[in-house]
Amino acid sequence: MEPIYKKYSKSKFDENGRLIDFKIDCPENFNFGYDVVDAIASAEPDKKALIYLDENGYERTFTFKEISDLSSKTANFLTKQGIKKGDKVMLILKRNYEYWYTITALHKIGAVAVPATHLLKTEDIVYRVNCIDVKAVICTGEDRVSHCVYESKAKCENLQKLFCVRKDVDGFIRLDEAIKTESADFERVDTKIDEPFILYFTSGTTGYPKPVTHNHTYPLAHIITAAYWQNVKDGGLHLTVSDTGWGKASWGKIYGQWLCGTAVMVYDYERFNSDEILRVIRDYGVTTFCAPPTVYRFIVKNGFKAEDFKNVSYVTTAGESLNPSIIEQFENVTGLLIREGFGQTETTLLIGNLVGCDVKVGSIGKPSPLYNVKIVKDNGEECEPDETGEIVVITNGDRDDGICISRGDSGNDDSRVFIDNVYHTGDLAYADKDGYYWYVSRKDDVIKSSGYRIGPFEIENVLMKHESVQECAITGVPDEERGFVVKATIVLVSGYEGSEELKTELKEYVKTHTAPYKYPRIIEFVHELPKTISGKIRRAEIRGDVK
C-alpha cells in the first residue's frame, strides 16, 4: 500500500525534486479517523502507528489496527455519555498514549478536540472552558492535573463531564477502563470538511490566549509539513519533541506522519533531559527528528555525539528562529543540516526549507506552494527584496486549507488578523533576491533606538555564539535620550558567574560582531526566561507589558 496521503493530494516537482505545486484533493466528507486511521488499519493491520516509552522504562507499541479499535471503543462510550458532533472536548493528556486513540475517537464522532497542556492551572482551565463552552474534559489522572480540572468545574457552568485515564479519581469517569467492554465497531458519523475539527489556544506572548479553530482539511494541510519538510518516510519512525497540548503535536506527532505511513515515537517524561532524548533517538532508531530551537540549544550546549543520530536522516525545527551558530555546530558533529520552518497555531507550515531546496543557514526557507505568502508594508504594498515587512497570506474568501476558520471568542475576533481576505501573521521578515525568507521578529518586538529599527534576533544570535550564554532575550527599555535602549536578559551556562566583568565582555563582544549601535547597554542575568506554555520567550513580560 502506498502512503495514503497520495490519495488526497496532488503534487508537482521540478527537476531537482523540489515541490513547486501542491493541492489538497479530498471528498466533502473526508474524516481523518475513518479515512486515514481506519483505512490504514484495514489495509495493513500490523503496521506500526506509535511506539510509546516512559521515563521508567515502560514500553508499548501500537499498530494502526489497535488505534482504530481503541478509538472506536472510545467513540462508542463517549457517545453514550452524551458527547456528540460539534461538542468541544478538552484533552489534557500530557504525552500519555491514550491521547492518540482518544483524539481519533473525537474526530470520528465529529466533536471538536481541544488539546491543552498539563501545565495549565485552575484559572487557566476555567478561562479556556468558559471562553468556548467546553462540554467535557478528558485528562490524565495525575494528582495535580486532575485536581485543577476538578476545581475548575464549579466555575464552569456548561462543563458537564469529567473523564480521566490511568488512575481512579473521585468525581471522574475512568475512561480507559470503561472502554474495555465497548464494541470496536462504530457507525460512521457524517462530517463535512468545512466543519470544526480541532481548536487550539494561541500561546499568548501578549494578552490572553485566543481560540483558533481549524476544519477537517487541517490534517491534509500537514502533508507538506511531514512529507516535504520533515521528510518522513513510509515505515519510518519520527520523533517530534512536544507535549500533546501544543500545536506542535499536530505538526509532528499524528496527522502528517500517519498520512505518510510513518510511526511516531512518544517519549513520556516529566522534566526535559537532553541525554535521555539522545538515548531514545539512538536506541529506538528514530529516522527523522523535529524539535523546538530550545531543545537543539540544550543538545549542543550539553554535548552530544554523531552516534546519537546514526539512524536519523533529516532534522527540522520551528517555533522561533534558531541561531545559525547552533545549526553549524550541530552539522559539524552529525553531518545533518537543521532545516527551519515557519508557521503558527493559526496555520500549518507557511514557509520552510523543503526537500530538494538548497539551504541558506539562518533563513526560514521559501513559501509553501499550498499558500500565497507575501511580505508587505504597512500600506499593503509588497516589499522589495531585502525590505522588511509583515508576513501575510493571501487567502480565498472561504479561507485556504490549513488556515484557521476562526480566531477569537466565538469567532468574532478576526478583524485584526483577517483584512480583506488577507491573513496577517504579525511577524516581520524580509526576502532576499533569491526568494529566501529571513525572520526578523514579531511586529511588537522591534526596538526603535536613536532612529534605528533593531530586531532582537540579530543580537540574540551574536550573544548565543559566546561560550557563557545558554539562552537570551533582547528587549527595549524606555530611554529619554534615545527613545529605547537595548537590554539583554541572559541565562548563563552552568559554571559562569554573572559579574560586572562578564557584562562588559559581552557588550564588547556584540560591538565587535555587529553594528555598534545594536549592543545591549543593559544586561541582566537571570536563572530562567519567562516563557509561554508552548516554550516561546515572553518578551512582553520581560518588557513589563504584561503582569
What are these regions (language model features)?
Residues 110, 220-240, 244-287, 302:
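Conserved AMP-binding/adenylation subdomain of ANL enzymes
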Residues 259, 286-291, 300-360, 372:
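Gly/Ser/Thr-rich phosphate-binding loop
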Residues 367-370, 381-416, 454:
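Conserved ATP/PPi-binding loop(s) of AMP-dependent carboxylate-activating enzymes
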Residues 120-121, 126-127, 137-142, 289, ...:
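AMP-binding/adenylate-forming catalytic core of the ANL superfamily
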Residues 80, 104, 108-177, 285, ...:
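Structural core segment of the AMP-binding/adenylate-forming
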Residues 45-48, 164-171, 180-201, 208, ...:
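Conserved pre-ATP/AMP-binding loop-to-beta segment of ANL
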Residues 46, 50-104, 121-126, 174-180, ...:
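Conserved AMP-binding/adenylate-forming core of the ANL superfamily
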Residues 60-65, 197-221:
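Conserved AMP-binding A3 loop
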